[in-house]
Swiss-Prot record:
It comes from Micrococcus luteus (Micrococcus lysodeikticus). GO terms for cellular component: cytoplasm. Catalyzes the GTP-dependent ribosomal translocation step during translation elongation. During this step, the ribosome changes from the pre-translocational (PRE) to the post-translocational (POST) state as the newly formed A-site-bound peptidyl-tRNA and P-site-bound deacylated tRNA move to the P and E sites, respectively. Catalyzes the coordinated movement of the two tRNA molecules, the mRNA and conformational changes in the ribosome. Belongs to the TRAFAC class translation factor GTPase superfamily. Classic translation factor GTPase family. EF-G/EF-2 subfamily. InterPro entries: EFG_II, EFG_III, EFG_III/V, EFG_IV, EFG_V, EFG_V-like, EFTu-like_2, G_TR_CS. It is found in: Cytoplasm. GO terms for biological process: ribosome disassembly. Gene3D superfamilies: 3.30.230.10, 3.30.70.240, Elongation Factor G (Translational Gtpase), domain 3 (3.30.70.870), P-loop containing nucleotide triphosphate hydrolases (3.40.50.300), Translation factors (2.40.30.10). GO terms for molecular function: GTP binding; GTPase activity; translation elongation factor activity. Disulfide bonds: none annotated. Residues 6-285 form the tr-type G domain. This is Elongation factor G. It holds the Pfam family GTP_EFTU.
Length: 701
């Protein structure tokens, strides 16, 4: 456990599904001496893939946090999932990292998912270095990959190494700063033993490329300061230290991204990459004090110094269920220190919590520690009310750190226990799983009485159901996936009058409202706005929130097919009340009924989620792929030629309802050679024929 924060790195490893993130992490752990046996993803033995499903599917779903040491530095690594259904995991870990290693597949270059994750990292300004992996693969092309970093990500790569040999003959790299070649000879099986790297001088073969890339690198570094620029222009050589300092500055400011290469699986190029993590990625102090706001006032900005002496503050960024300890809460400590048994304030929820045991995690092995200190990542036991995104702090110095925003689910399944005995287990399971992943939403459908789970995609929900059966031993029936439709209005309706009155002996009920409704033009943002334009006290102030609440009640069920309403602005214009008979309840009912009447007149429509789909296919199947997407009501955006291997890329917007079972159809149409990815794009109006079908279905059930 290092206390000198200059020597600490909190990093994530981010990439596309199969670019080799987990293998890269495993190699980090192997080289830093934490792991004595190598785990391979395709054997299901990787240390960071610790849930059973991950081992089976060979993909990483939850970000495991792992600590290791290299060259007298402590590296806390978070392994991120690369599958698009698990964006929340990536988003979460990026929020608490100081830097990241972006792993690219040397053959594929920047893939759709790498792009999504890269944009998420841009959102949080995370400094990154790039590792072009799988250089030993057939068709691997380092220069093509660097080119895609520029073209697809619009980023500025700093090439730090060039590969020696390609595909099966890939043996090592040339370091462009020291101009030395690092070669990992390996035996006949390509097995490279621990620490067996040695240096040889530059060879004649690649001089031209080396010279070009080294000049580019030196020029980029020279631009970081006037002194270096002068030195460079006068033709003086920059020293190795100057170049490294310049690269570090560009990296920490996220102005450029150093690029390294290797094959993690074949153990080539891993050590220089670890050196680069230490040399170029920021330490917890580089980002400066962490900012937050006062508990009751978002306008009041507060800061906490990154030091042990400052008041304690931390962000809970992940909840995991552990087989023995129950709930583990992963926290990033931004300031101060804390011992186990201490009391903290959950400032987000306004509740006090007591810290139980404290651990530094190594995938799913725990190393107990007595205290936590600023700049590190830990797992805590004993927190009852804390969920993802909550701030924990010193009760005497409350602060709320910037939290995370999570997308709304686009797909849901109905779930019901098979037996009465499963009912209780089911609700416990759902509670725990939702605490772990905030993009799962649980909803009790009042009409059908079923519990519905919403998520980010089919795989996301599959894993949920799978874990429920395995970890919580719940037997449940799972319905077919349902699309999360929404309803809205197309035109403005002025002055909708509604009077609610009841006279039944004793005190009656009376409320009169006049409202106008109009569509809000926000493809993603605001769901609803309410404005009060009543003047002169025609309706007393205290009843206005009830009108608003009544409208929101009615918005839960649209008038066409009962889906939630979105993108509506309501304005209350006028009304009347009665001294004795008016009540909050009466105005709530009036607001609700006026809304239902108004919506019917405002051309109600149904909206459906559109997905941005990207298909990569060999050229000969291009026609079939496009025809198939068209038959699914897809709008083809662009078709483009890809790399030298002749792969074509098709981008389309396709309704989610048409994408069920797509993977099977795509495989059979392209002999399993095409791949696709999809992310939520926006909500759009459903064509009339489809809308009629949806309405009929909802009434027929």
């Amino acid at each position: 456990m290092l206390t000198d924060l200059h020597k600490v790195r909190n990093i994530g490893i981010m990439a596309h599904i199969d670019a080799g993130k987990t293998t890269t992490t495993e190699r980090h752990l192997f080289y830093t001496g934490v792991n004595h046996k190598l785990g391979e993803t395709h054997d299901g033995g990787a240390t960071t893939d610790w849930m059973e499903q991950e081992k089976e599917r060979g993909i990483t779903i939850t970000s495991a946090a792992v600590t290791c040491f290299w060259n007298d530095h402590q590296i806390n690594i978070i392994d991120n999932p690369g599958h698009v259904d698990f964006t929340v995991e990536v988003e979460r870990s990026l929020r608490v990292l100081d830097g990241a290693v972006a792993v690219f597949d040397g053959k594929e270059g920047v893939e759709p998912q790498s792009e999504t994750v890269w944009r998420q990292a841009d959102k949080y300004d995370v400094p990154r270095i790039c590792f072009v992996n799988k250089m030993d693969k057939l068709g691997a092309d380092f220069y093509f990959t660097v080119d895609t970093i520029v073209k697809r990500l619009g980023a500025r790569p700093l090439v730090m190494q060039l590969p020696i040999g390609a595909e099966n003959d890939f043996v090592g790299v040339v370091d462009l700063i020291s101009m030395k070649a690092f070669v990992w000879p390996g035996d006949a099986n390509g097995i490279v033993t621990m620490g067996a790297s040695y240096e040889i001088e530059i060879r004649q073969l690649q001089e031209k490329a080396e010279e070009e890339y080294r000049n580019e690198l030196v020029e980029a570094v020279a631009e970081t300061s006037e002194e270096l620029m002068e030195k460079y222009l006068e033709g003086e050589e920059l020293t190795v230290e100057e170049i490294q300092a310049g690269v570090r500055q560009l990296t920490v400011n996220a102005e450029a991204y150093p690029v390294f290469c290797g094959s993690a699986f074949k153990n080539r190029g891993v050590q220089p990459m670890l050196d680069a993590v230490v040399a170029y990625l920021p330490n917890p102090l580089d980002a400066g004090p962490v900012k937050g706001h006062a508990v009751n006032d978002e306008e009041v900005v507060l800061e906490r110094e990154v030091s042990k002496e400052a008041p304690f503050s931390a962000l809970a960024f992940k909840i995991a269920t552990h087989p023995f300890f129950g709930t583990l809460t992963f926290i990033r400590v931004y300031s101060g220190r804390l011992e186990s048994g201490a009391q903290v304030l959950n400032a987000t929820k306004g509740k006090k919590e007591r810290i139980g045991k404290l651990f530094q995690m190594h995938a799913n092995k725990e190393n107990p520690v007595d205290e936590v200190v600023a700049g590190h990542i830990y797992a805590v036991i004993g927190l009852k009310d804390t969920t993802t995104g909550d701030t924990l702090c010193d009760p005497a110095n409350p602060i709320i750190l910037e939290s995370m925003t999570f997308p709304e689910p686009v797909i849901s399944v109905a779930i019901e226990p098979k037996t009465k005995g499963d009912q209780e287990k089911l609700s416990t399971a759902i509670q725990k799983l939702v605490a772990e992943d905030p993009t799962f939403r649980v909803n009790l459908n009042e009409e059908t009485g079923q519990t519905e789970i919403g998520g980010m995609g089919e795989l996301h929900l599959d894993v949920f159901v799978d874990r429920m059966k395995r970890e919580f031993k719940v037997e449940a029936n799972v319905g077919k996936p349902q699309v999360a439709y929404r309803e809205t209005i197309k035109r403005k309706v002025d002055k909708v009058d509604y009077t609610h009155k009841k006279q039944t002996g004793g005190s009656g009920q009376f409320a009169k409202v006049q409202l106008s409704f109009e569509p809000l033009d926000t493809p993603r943002g605001t769901v609803y706005e309410f404005e009060n334009a009543i003047t002169g006290g025609r309706v007393p102030r205290e009843y206005i929130p009830s009108v608003d609440a009544g409208i929101q009640d009615a918005m839960k069920f649209g008038v066409l097919a009962g889906y939630p309403m979105v993108r509506v602005k309501a304005t209350s214009l006028d009304g009347a009340y009665h001294d004795v008979d008016s009540s909050e309840m009466a105005f709530r009912i009036a607001g609700s009924q006026a809304f239902k009447e108004g919506v019917r007149k405002a051309t109600p429509i149904i909206l459906e989620p559109l997905m941005a789909v990207e298909v990569r296919t060999p050229e000969e199947f291009m026609g079939d792929v496009i025809g198939d997407l068209n038959s699914r009501r897809g709008q083809i955006q662009i078709q483009s030629m890809e790399d030298a291997t002749g792969v074509k890329v098709v981008n389309a917007l396709v309704p989610l309802s048409e994408m069920f079972g797509y993977i099977g159809d795509l495989r059979s149409k392209t002999q399993g050679r095409a791949v696709y990815s999809m992310t939520f794009h926006s909500y759009a109006e459903v064509p009339k024929a489809v809308a009629d079908e949806i309405v009929q279905k909802s009434q027929g059930e």
